[in-house]
């Protein structure tokens, strides 16, 4: 995806931002440009804390990559998988791991802002070690594991801030939330603007409508 993107083919583009349809910019284009010009060469990700990593390596991470998850496009065309899938799912219901462990696994948010140097490094690693990417087949939420595991040990010299993704995301809301992360609304505006985030998430039509108008008005003025 990165290698085929028009942005990657344009050598003058220095930064790449992974976002989804539930993200919204909370800084103006000029503010964002100035930020990355000031911090040129730095990249931004969010890695789970050391304490979280130690705890989640016991069950949360292995459940994602040591169990078989049949979400990959085209898997249902494989008759062998279709034959054995009911048996595999029954065994895995008891958290019996059928796949080998990945040593020194790390994880975090899959929303990042990378300098081109990190993009090129990641693509080089995939090209040099294609089996590592192949190992990610039939896993789930693997975009929260693959790059973090790849980049963790080299984060310092790659200039990656590992606890700052430049995203405003509320995983620990002080008000009731139907889902996590919190779906943001106008009550979150001040906290968003006081943060250093360039994107906020999650936003949804209807619920976040007033917040989006406030952010749009603010970024037009700046």
Can you annotate each of these PLM segments?
Residues 1-222:
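ER/Golgi luminal nucleotide-sugar-dependent glycosyltransferases, focusing on the catalytic module
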């Amino acid at each position: 995806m990165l290698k085929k993107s028009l942005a990657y083919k344009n050598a003058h583009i220095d930064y790449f931002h992974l976002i989804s349809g539930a993200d919204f910019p909370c800084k103006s284009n000029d503010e964002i440009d100035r930020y990355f010009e000031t911090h040129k060469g730095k990249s931004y990700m969010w890695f789970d804390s050391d304490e979280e990593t130690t705890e989640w390596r016991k069950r949360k991470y292995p459940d994602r990559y040591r169990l078989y998850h049949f979400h990959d496009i085209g898997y249902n065309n494989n008759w062998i998988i279709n034959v054995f899938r009911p048996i595999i799912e029954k065994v895995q219901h008891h958290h019996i791991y059928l796949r080998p462990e990945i040593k020194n696994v790390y994880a975090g948010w899959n929303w990042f802002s990378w300098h081109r140097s990190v993009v090129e490094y990641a693509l080089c690693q995939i090209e040099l070690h294609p089996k590592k990417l192949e190992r990610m087949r039939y896993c789930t939420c693997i975009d929260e594991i693959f790059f973090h595991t790849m980049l963790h040990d080299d984060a310092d010299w790659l200039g990656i801030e590992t606890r700052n993704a430049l995203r405003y995301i509320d995983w620990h809301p002080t008000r009731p939330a139907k889902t996590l992360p919190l779906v943001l609304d106008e009550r979150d505006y001040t906290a968003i603007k006081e943060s250093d985030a360039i994107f906020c998430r999650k936003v949804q039509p209807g619920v976040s409508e007033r917040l989006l108008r406030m952010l749009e008005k603010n970024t037009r003025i700046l």
